[in-house]
From Swiss-Prot:
Key word Lipoprotein present: no
Originating organism: Mus musculus (Mouse)
Protein's recorded name: Coiled-coil domain-containing protein 160
Protein keywords: Coiled coil
Keyword presence, Coiled coil: yes
Length: 323
């Protein structure tokens, strides 16, 4: 596991110097034939590295160790064959170069199509889902929308923290790999067959460095997008909180006004009832007074009638008294 991790770190970033820089500075001038053969070797090595790099672009990161070992074995065998057959490699150089160019063009075209398709999906699909979600959430009550936005804000906060943590780890790894690459560049002076191996390692480090830089850039963009979404959701959350606070205040005002109206209505009704009760009491009092007056008048009238009857019929009284 440690050896694999070390190899992965070695294949992650490239130094700024390679073995050719040291050899070109220290080597004496070569004859024309030896220089042409060396140029052919160098060109074939670059073409082979170029083709291997293009074929390895679509692989996953976990399979880089195995593919780099296979590429090293193939390139070692190619170097031995080129040293034995220098004249034959001169004729095969052009064909390998054009094949690698065609392969590079096809790989770039396919990767460009994949990137364009993925970019369209990333741009169109989130926009459509965002519009649908917005229409769906606008029909909700404010409290439910506030609850959902709080949950989404918490999830985005966790995601943002994870992205920041990954970004910090990637920056730390980048710094460590650059230090290791610089140390390897200073100590990188092995002659012979080790030169081609170091060239391949340098190329792999360059490829991994570009990939790491792309990953860091993507993480930075995702972090920025997450921050923008969090800012937008925080604004919506604040607006919803303001709306809920206003609705609560309005509800309290309406409740207070309703209580005041009910109190006034109760007082008015009680006043009306008291007035009606007083009027009824007055009527009863007047009725009692009239009844007393009528009873007295009837009594006086009865006495008067009785006296009149007695005075108008004395014989009847006399006869009645006799009998």
């Amino acid at each position: 596991m440690d050896a694999r991790r070390k190899h992965w770190k070695d294949n992650t970033f490239t130094p700024f110097l390679n073995e050719h820089d040291f050899q070109e500075a220290a080597a004496p001038p070569q004859p024309l034939s030896e220089q042409s053969s060396a140029d052919n070797h160098k060109r074939m090595g670059r073409v082979s590295n170029f083709s291997v790099r293009n074929t390895q672009e679509g692989n996953k990161f976990k399979r880089k160790d195995y593919s780099s070992q296979i590429a090293e074995g193939e390139q070692d065998s190619n170097l031995r064959e080129r040293r034995m057959n220098v004249s034959k490699n001169d004729a095969n150089t052009n064909s390998a170069f054009w094949d690698s160019l065609h392969l590079d063009d096809a790989t770039k075209e396919s990767s460009h199509r994949r990137e364009s398709a993925s970019a369209w999906n990333k741009k169109k699909l989130p926009a459509a889902t965002q519009v649908t979600r917005k229409k769906w959430t606008e029909a909700m009550p404010p409290k439910l929308r506030l609850h959902l936005l709080n949950e989404e804000l918490g999830e985005l906060s966790l995601k943002c923290r994870e992205i920041e943590r990954d970004f910090e780890n990637a920056e730390k790894e980048l710094l460590n790999f650059r230090k290791e690459a610089s140390v390897k560049a200073v100590n990188f002076q092995e002659p012979g067959t080790g030169a081609s191996k170091k060239d391949r390692e340098l190329q792999a480090l360059k490829n991994d460095l570009s990939e790491k830089a792309t990953n860091v850039k993507n993480l930075t963009e995702e972090l920025q997008q997450a921050k923008e979404v969090m800012y937008r959701l925080s604004l919506e959350n604040r607006n919803l909180k303001d709306a809920v606070r206003k609705l609560k205040h309005q509800t309290e005002l309406n409740t207070a006004l309703l209580r005041e109206e009910m109190k006034l209505f109760y007082e008015l009704e009680m006043e009306k009832i008291r007035l009606e009760l007083g009027a009824i009491k007055n009527e009863l009092r007047v009725e009692k007074t009239l009844r007393v007056k009528n009873s007295r008048a009837l009594e006086v009238l009865g006495r008067h009638v009785a006296s009149v009857v007695r005075s108008s019929n004395p014989a009847d009284h006399f006869t009645g008294n006799i009998f």
